[in-house]
Amino acid sequence: DVYKRQIFFGSVGWPEKIPDHISLWGSLLKFRREFDQYINLRPVKLMPGVPSPLANRKPGDIDFYIIRENTEGEYSSIGGKMFPDTEREIVMQETIMSRVGVDRVLKFAFELANKTEKKHLTSATKSNGISITMPYWDERVENMAKQYSEVKWDKYHIDILCAHFVLNPDKFNVVVASNLFGDILSDLGPACTGTIGIAPSGNINPEKKFPSLFEPVHGSAPDIAGQGIALSLIHISEPTRQEVIS
């Protein structure tokens, strides 16, 4: 049964009642980590009928994928607070990049790029400022690229990469990034197509040992709660189930 192999996850959160970091760590991040959904796949595509905020862009001009590492990186839970409420107060949170964690997301990204017509991959980095983890990321990208000789690849520091998303979105095909950088880019990309309101997101366990999870990118919109105007399953052609949960 297809419904036993995947999870449809609606937007969650009510910032006025519960801080976002609590609702996120207590729900979505638990799914990602406990089900080893290490790939976050975000298609970025300008759809017919949705005007892009970028000048002279039409459907077909913006069409690429963002692959985000989804279970480690900058969003690790390793860290803490010392000397709270004193002048010596210190907070720390460590970035974790394992070889297996980095390589498996890079392998997925290169394989996807190899299946596309453009056969091009872009890596997001910041190795000119983050002096340990990002040079390691670059090293693993270069090593993985040797296994995919047909794929052309390049890398950009995250700041200028954001600028290119706005100025030259048509140049991209597959973009691969660490957890934090991928999180930023996967909102910026859909925004360039006119709205994040219809942007999809997949949290994937490619080996299918665990179910994958699919969600909208947009927020929970608590301001329209109780009005009966949110059609949460219509977009996946499930009107019957929509009626059940409405």
Regions found by a protein language model. Name each.
Residues 1-92, 180:
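N-terminal glycine-rich phosphate/adenylate-binding segment common to multiple enzyme folds
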Residues 51-57, 110-113, 162-166:
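A generic local secondary-structure boundary/capping motif
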Residues 220-227:
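Short pre-catalytic strand/loop immediately N-terminal to key active-site residues, enriched for Gly-Thr
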Residues 86-158:
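Glycine-rich phosphate/diphosphate-binding loop of Rossmann-like nucleotide-binding domains
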Residues 204-218:
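Acidic-glycine-rich active-site phosphate/pyrophosphate-binding loop
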Residues 4-19, 144, 150-208:
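Glycine-rich phosphate-binding loop
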